[in-house]
């Protein structure tokens, strides 16, 4: 039997999603939970996205194949949640086809980067980047239009054999002292979203313009600013799955 579920986690204490020897990861904790209730059998977790160290998620999608005794999805989900640590949980389990792979099934991924644009606030800045100087959000949002569409994003991510990606939308909004950068695309290069945020922050500070973004897209061998925004402000909020019919998986609550 193969199951899929939404996963939510606080990335603060993790070295990323993907298993890494000797380091605490989201995949590692999920596989440990399955191993503990599956009699010690190694059960591999597959994820829709490989978030970096410190990055959070409220809409990650995972899947695994359960070969243990026949058990209702609701009961198995409850057992998994009971042994997971406090900083990660899964939503209701859904039966999927044996060949279902979240990474291949994902047709859209949505991230949000949160900025606290005000006086120092230890509580707010646990999940948001603190920026003291007032940002020009209008300039940031206007410039972000240049990034929408299908481009070579080499300048905004690590080296990749296929750097062509499609962004469906990039929006920058302000609500009081909270500024959010929402980025939606088909897939992302490593640190691509945080590099985009760093570039938009330069524009918000008046240090760069929309023309600079356009130049970076035309010259993919040049890393834009060579900087990435810190991970703690970033959250993978939603993964849209394709298929015929599209796969539908509920939120990470249970």
Region roles according to the model:
Residues 1-254:
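Structured-RNA-binding interfaces characteristic of tRNA pseudouridine synthases
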């Amino acid at each position: 039997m193969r199951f899929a579920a939404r996963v939510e986690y606080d990335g603060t204490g993790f070295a990323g999603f993907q298993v890494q020897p000797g380091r605490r990861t989201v995949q590692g904790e999920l596989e440990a939970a399955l191993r503990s209730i599956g009699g010690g059998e190694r059960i591999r977790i597959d994820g829709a996205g490989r978030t970096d160290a410190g990055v959070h998620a409220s809409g990650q999608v995972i899947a695994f194949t359960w070969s243990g005794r026949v058990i209702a999805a609701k009961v198995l989900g409850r057992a998994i949640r009971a042994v997971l640590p406090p900083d990660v949980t899964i939503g209701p389990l859904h039966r999927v086809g044996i060949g279902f792979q979240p990474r291949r099934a994902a047709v859209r991924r949505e991230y949000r980067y949160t900025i606290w644009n005000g006086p120092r606030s230890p509580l707010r800045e646990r999940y948001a980047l603190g920026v003291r100087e007032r940002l020009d959000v209008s300039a940031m949002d206007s410039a972000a239009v240049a990034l929408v569409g299908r481009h070579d994003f080499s300048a905004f991510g690590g080296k990749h054999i296929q750097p062509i990606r499609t962004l469906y939308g990039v929006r920058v909004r302000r609500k009081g002292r909270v500024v959010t950068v929402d980025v939606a695309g088909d897939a992302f290069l490593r640190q691509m979203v945080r590099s985009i945020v760093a570039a938009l922050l330069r524009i918000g500070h008046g240090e760069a313009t929309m023309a600079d973004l356009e130049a970076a897209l035309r010259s993919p061998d040049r890393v834009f600013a060579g900087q990435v925004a810190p991970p703690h402000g970033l959250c993978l909020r939603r993964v849209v799955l394709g298929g015929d019919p599209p796969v539908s998986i509920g939120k990470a609550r249970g």
